[in-house]
Amino acid sequence: MAALTLQSVKKTYDGKQFVLHGIDVDVADGEFVVMVGPSGCGKSTLLRMVAGLERISEGSISIAGKVVNQLEPKDRNIAMVFQNYALYPHMSVAENMGYALKIAGVDRAQIQKRVNAAAQILELEALLQRKPRELSGGQRQRVAMGRAIVREPAVFLFDEPLSNLDARLRVQMRLEIQRLHARLATTSLYVTHDQIEAMTLAQRVIVMNKGHAEQIGAPTEVYERPATVFVASFIGSPGMNLLEGRVSDDGAVFAVAGNGPELPLAGVVSIGREVAKGREWTLGIRPEHMSPGQADAPHATLTVDSCELLGADNLAHGRWGKHDVTVRLPHAHRPAAGEALQVALPAQHLHFFDPASGRRAN
């Protein structure tokens, strides 16, 4: 195992415009770090640079303290698991898993030993003689992971490995990857656009946007204290409600822009010196923190436009001024369109962002 270090890593294709803007990341020995972001944010490009499939324009990448910028992928002691399983259709499961070792000249007994050990970890023993066409999608992905495990790499790289699976299989495979990391404790860098994968798998999350690492932190930190408006809107399903407006001169209310209501801030501003009174801010609050019935929190009225019934809970939708607002409600609470909903504004769950920079203020 080994630490993975990225220092001021940049990427440009034309020498003028950068698609990655100085990424600094330290992945500790045995740590599982997930890069998450929308399509085109640079996460897969960065992973390919770590793998050696893309050249680095500036900066350095080190594995186990050794700079690998100029090394070929085969010399970096890494193993990749892709979105596409990339299994040889004419080979058995065992042959697929051991093929890279065979090419590397590892003796047959050692290959068999490693393949059997990986098959036991992944519960593939009964499938070793089958061909890929005889396997389910989840089984094929386990074979792809087994092929990576037998190499005993310093670093695992995962490039959206669950994207081809249906929802049920994704849940199952997330659990299997968690168990796999708990058992092997191999340094891992995982790329996904799915925030659920990021939040459930990661020890730390890197939220990527337009070639920048917007925030790096534990899943709870990224959820509870988003560093930017982008992180607030991207992490969470649905994302945080973000309202443009102005804190009053006395700090008592937040006037929502676009002829929206004045939201009570009783006990809030004491928001601190960072959030000045009498100026414009972007106020954020998550749908799940607005549920009615919180007796000790200020409340405001939201007229319901529609309600989505999700099973375990419901989402009520309305508008304050020019802003769409979503509130997560318990399963039994199903307001009708036109109903006035008294939603909570608990002080500890209000987030203030600078409208110019998008950075967190409080």
From Swiss-Prot:
This entry's Enzyme Commission designation comes to 7.6.2.10
Superkingdom to which the source organism belongs: Bacteria
Q: Which UniProt keywords apply?
A: ATP-binding, Cell inner membrane, Cell membrane, Membrane, Nucleotide-binding, Sugar transport, Translocase, Transport
Q: Which reaction does it catalyse?
A: sn-glycerol 3-phosphate(out) + ATP + H2O = sn-glycerol 3-phosphate(in) + ADP + phosphate + H(+)
Asked if Ribonucleoprotein is a keyword of the record, the answer is no
Annotated membrane topology:
Peripheral membrane protein
Localization, UniProt: Cell inner membrane
A Pfam family: ABC_tran
GO CC terms? ATP-binding cassette (ABC) transporter complex, substrate-binding subunit-containing
Residue stretches making up the ABC transporter domain: 4-235
Single Gene Ontology MF annotation: ABC-type glycerol-3-phosphate transporter activity
Q: What class of enzyme is it?
A: translocase
UniProt cross-references to InterPro entries, sorted A to Z: AAA+_ATPase, ABC_transporter-like_ATP-bd, ABC_transporter-like_CS, ABC_transpr_MalK-like, ABC_transpr_MalK/UgpC-like, Mo/tungstate-bd_C_term_dom, NA-bd_OB-fold, OB_MalK-like
**Which GO biological process entries does UniProt record here?**
carbohydrate transport; glycerophosphodiester transmembrane transport
Q: Where does ATP bind?
A: 37-44
Please indicate if the UniProt record lists Cell inner membrane as a keyword: yes
Q: How does it assemble?
A: The complex is composed of two ATP-binding proteins (UgpC), two transmembrane proteins (UgpA and UgpE) and a solute-binding protein (UgpB).
Q: What does this protein do?
A: Part of the ABC transporter complex UgpBAEC involved in sn-glycerol-3-phosphate (G3P) import. Responsible for energy coupling to the transport system.
What family does the entry list? Belongs to the ABC transporter superfamily. sn-glycerol-3-phosphate importer (TC 3.A.1.1.3) family.
Record PANTHER family:
MALTODEXTRIN IMPORT ATP-BINDING PROTEIN MSMX, SN-GLYCEROL-3-PHOSPHATE IMPORT ATP-BINDING PROTEIN UGPC
Q: Name the chain's protein.
A: sn-glycerol-3-phosphate import ATP-binding protein UgpC
- Protein source organism: Paraburkholderia xenovorans (strain LB400)
